């Protein structure tokens, strides 16, 4: 496994706004304080940096973290978390194409991630089809914490995590409404209102209504969001934040796939269009409701010690009717299908208790963190499947989308599951500053339990099974960063992760958790005037204890000897080149390999892992006669990836262009104060591109999308 190093170009992307804290950075103290105050005003007193769970500056953290702030989200007009991550290095989005947007599916440093965090708490996922999504309309910024994060967050993949920071009440009255239209007969309205109620209370109200045609023919997308929150100053040192997030998705487009032949690969009979739908409009439904009710209670005992309790309750449900495909027939056009449905509901609780303090020992300042968190999920799942490909087949080049008669379907298989899982974690962290040296160390103990009760019915035969997981794990993290003159800060770190693994080996011994560890080194840069930032990082991640097939009994219990290695380089930065022009770029070079397996997969690269990714975005503010105008443009490149696990073919690389423009109408007339218009285009030249899991399951990338928006702020 050899990693080729191309010429490195200095690149740029926003890392973060400086946070509050008594520890001095290398930049002037007045700039730090002003920026910190501004950040805390926007993000709220209960905000904590994702990488440390403290108010410390991410630029001091010896591990890579990328931040996409609210201004960037607004300028680019994103409508999903995956879209918001398109310009983040090390992250590959749209794993299932652009027509599928009901789930946030992406990988970080090569490892798939299906669970986001919202305001520091896990969005609980039942590992089936009920994944809570947060719409960007309710997000203040996104923070991508690269590498293992288990010391602070418990069970997570080793590639990293995404934390979505919610919009919080502000004391200054601000009200924004907008309407939008565009591709797919888009109809959208948004509301964002905040202000003080009295000296103790401040509110925020965010709302959204969106309806549009999906990319695939016959499909629709519809979403409603209602997200109020309240800050209650209970005293000079105590703040209570109450928050609600409700989202209803009556329709969520499609989830069906297309074969590689006719999409990512040539078919002798022709090629499919990017609006292809190989499901059935009589059996295509996804209806989801998500309610998140939470609070944050923070109290400052004094200037050195604070406590924060962050808690949330989730109630979610989803109903789905869909089809899946067999391999394409020998005639290169007939596709056999099965019909299935899922009916799912989940209820869960997540709570995180944090005690943070500052202690001086000689010339060293310690920022201590002690935490205890707990999560519980109760999930119920019904799955029914016709099996035997008894649903009507479809001609991929002349599809009939109305063949299925729901009442005539016979379900030969049914599975009812009740899943109850809990995780308790205790963690300790110390971040120490000694002059220009910043060192961090942390440890965490986790206890994970899961019980699964399954009752299956297959062609009239009833059976029941019980599965139990009781695993614990100890995770560690260490790192150091040194601030040199000129704004450069080299760093190095080591971090660990774990993920529970169900089942037992052939001796009946329960499997151990899958573990990961990462070595990372790099350098961060922040100019004195804070107009330029950059991060160069090199990483090496190893994931162990993956399940593999026993070569002596391929249908028997698995062996726990699998190993995967991901290593690479990321370059990220941002520069304000002039007062009118800014530039952001990033580059990722990654090599991922299955290094231990009992099958021919050893030595292969997993799917969805391009070797190279790069992007560039620039904003220009003309001024003069065009005062109030902004024009932005971006390029994003995703290299070729493996088409299937056996690496038999490649998914082609692609280069896409996005654009956006906005204009403050007050520049035309003072009577139009507060009004603005914007225009955004994604995949401007309508490039056709693909994503594949294997030869039978591919997805089209997002077609060109254009959106026009009228805003009014008062």
Each language-model region and where it sits:
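Membrane-embedded beta-barrel scaffold of Gram-negative outer-membrane proteins
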Residues: 296-300, 306-312, 318-322, 513-576, ...
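Extracytoplasmic beta-strand/coil segments of soluble accessory domains associated
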Residues: 43-45, 49-58, 62, 82, ...
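Acidic/polar loop-and-plug regions of large Gram-negative outer-membrane beta-barrel proteins
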Residues: 210, 214, 227-233, 237-300, ...
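Conserved C-terminal beta-signal and adjacent last beta-strands/turns
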Residues: 344, 368, 607-714
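Short acidic/polar hinge/loop motifs at secondary-structure boundaries
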Residues: 105, 121-146, 165-166
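Gram-negative outer-membrane beta-barrel transporters
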Residues: 436, 540, 560-645, 688, ...
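Outer-membrane beta-barrel translocator/receptor signature
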Residues: 125, 137-140, 151-228, 232-238, ...
